[in-house]
């Protein structure tokens, strides 16, 4: 068997997320069907990040196995040909060791969350960022973010449907940068809880609106209660950037 590692980008707006689900179109299903069309093999694709409906990716990593060797550049061309009806594309493919696993071999995952912060919406960024019309206090958000760095119990920031065995996660990066009318939040960790990034963003926006003081983020973290945190930020602003191995 030959194991292939591919890097994928997609717009999640019209898709049901990464994971295959009955009755809806997912990124996993689109790619698995494309691979079957040129290889004749039914494969199972394993992804580094199981993104939700509406979430985008610029560097999602996945792997699959084929019984016969195909040149990586031909795989890229073939997949991109058969996924053309959808906003999904592969921009890298390489052979990987048989013990490589896109999900379990990853040592870190990186996300960006985009906020358009101006009085009027951005047509160009429709469904690609969270538009917030009122000015956000970025220094206050940065101050609040510092409380979340490191190893913590992130129960307050996990979805009620989260299936992770433990709420303990280590947030290694949470940087907030304002560039003109756009605010970007950069987050990285070995792994994340379901909705963790979006719940963190929703809570930091309450700080940015001066509804909460920066110090309240520490109280929310210590509460270990989802009801203590802010709303879940829209999926449209979230991007899976890359996985490190």
Swiss-Prot record:
Pfam families in the cross-refs: PseudoU_synth_1
A GO BP entry: tRNA pseudouridine synthesis
EC number(s) reported in the record: 5.4.99.12
EC top class, as a word: isomerase
Catalyzed reaction equations: uridine(38/39/40) in tRNA = pseudouridine(38/39/40) in tRNA
InterPro entries named in the record: PsdUridine_synth_cat_dom_sf, PsdUridine_synth_TruA, PsdUridine_synth_TruA_a/b_dom, PsdUridine_synth_TruA_C, TruA/RsuA/RluB/E/F_N
Keyword line: Isomerase, tRNA processing
Catalytic site positions: 52 (nucleophile)
GO molecular function: RNA binding; tRNA pseudouridine(38-40) synthase activity
Residues given in the record as substrate binding sites: 111
Sequence similarity: Belongs to the tRNA pseudouridine synthase TruA family.
Subunit structure: Homodimer.
Function: Formation of pseudouridine at positions 38, 39 and 40 in the anticodon stem and loop of transfer RNAs.
Protein's recorded name: tRNA pseudouridine synthase A
Originating organism: Rickettsia rickettsii (strain Sheila Smith)
């Amino acid at each position: 068997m030959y194991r292939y590692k591919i890097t994928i980008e997609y717009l999640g707006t019209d898709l049901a997320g990464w994971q295959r689900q009955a009755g809806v179109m997912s990124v996993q299903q689109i790619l698995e069907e494309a691979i079957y069309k040129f290889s004749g093999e039914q494969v199972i694709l394993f992804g580094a990040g199981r993104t939700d409906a509406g979430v985008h990716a610029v560097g999602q990593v996945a792997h699959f196995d084929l019984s016969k060797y195909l040149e990586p550049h031909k795989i890229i061309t073939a997949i991109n040909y058969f996924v053309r009806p959808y906003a999904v594309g592969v921009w890298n493919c390489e052979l990987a060791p048989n013990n490589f696993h896109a999900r379990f071999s990853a040592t870190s995952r990186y996300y960006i969350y985009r906020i358009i912060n101006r009085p009027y919406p951005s047509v160009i960024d429709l469904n690609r960022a969270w538009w917030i019309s009122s000015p956000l206090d970025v220094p206050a958000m940065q101050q609040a973010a510092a409380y979340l760095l490191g190893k913590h119990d992130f129960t307050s920031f996990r979805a009620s449907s989260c299936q992770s065995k433990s709420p303990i996660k280590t947030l290694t990066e949470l940087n907030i940068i304002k560039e003109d009318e756009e605010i970007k939040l950069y987050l990285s960790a070995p792994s994340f809880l379901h909705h963790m990034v979006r719940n963190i963003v929703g809570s930091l926006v309450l700080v940015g609106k001066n509804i909460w003081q920066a110090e309240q983020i520490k109280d929310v973290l210590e509460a270990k209660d989802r009801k203590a945190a802010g709303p879940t930020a829209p999926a449209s602003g979230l991007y899976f950037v890359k996985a490190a191995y």
